[in-house]
Amino acid sequence: AVGALSAGSLGFAVQNHVNVTQFVNGCLAGLVAITAGCFAVSTPVACLIGLVGGMISVGGDELLKYLGIDDAVGAIPVHLGAGIWGTLAVGLYGNLEILGTGLTRGEQIGVQLLGILVCAVWVFGVAYITVRLLDRITPLRVPAEHEDAGLNLSEHGEVEDYEIPEHVLAEFRGTNVRQPHSTDRE
């Protein structure tokens, strides 16, 4: 809940309007962030971790837009960004006795950073190899000329005309235009 509130509030402050997707992604980011250390932190600290997770979801989404990276549902900042934060938060805020590792705070943070690095290298490596192998079997990207023409045309031989009828536009603009009748059509 705190992640949803922080994401919604930050999103409103940045965009000057309420965005439901930011609330939902903030809620998810808060949950992702607290998952790793939920057993080892107090309720106020859990709220802080969720709050930062929600803010990361908004900031990460804005960063991806700025970089031109397409993430239609905000999965990268919600899972990657808030996940990294939550993993670090275990080292920063986790009760060392409950964690039971015998490490100092600094050592625990180091272990959490090492875990993030190992996971990143492993996931990137496996994903890269898998995608390269799949691309050899069947191309994962269509040729540029197919993108330019549109996949409906290049793959299906179909063209869609999305022109909005004038009476619909007029109604949307608030003017009163006579609507076509069946006798008006040829």
Can you describe what each PLM-predicted range is?
Residues 1-186:
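Glycine- and aromatic-enriched membrane alpha-helices
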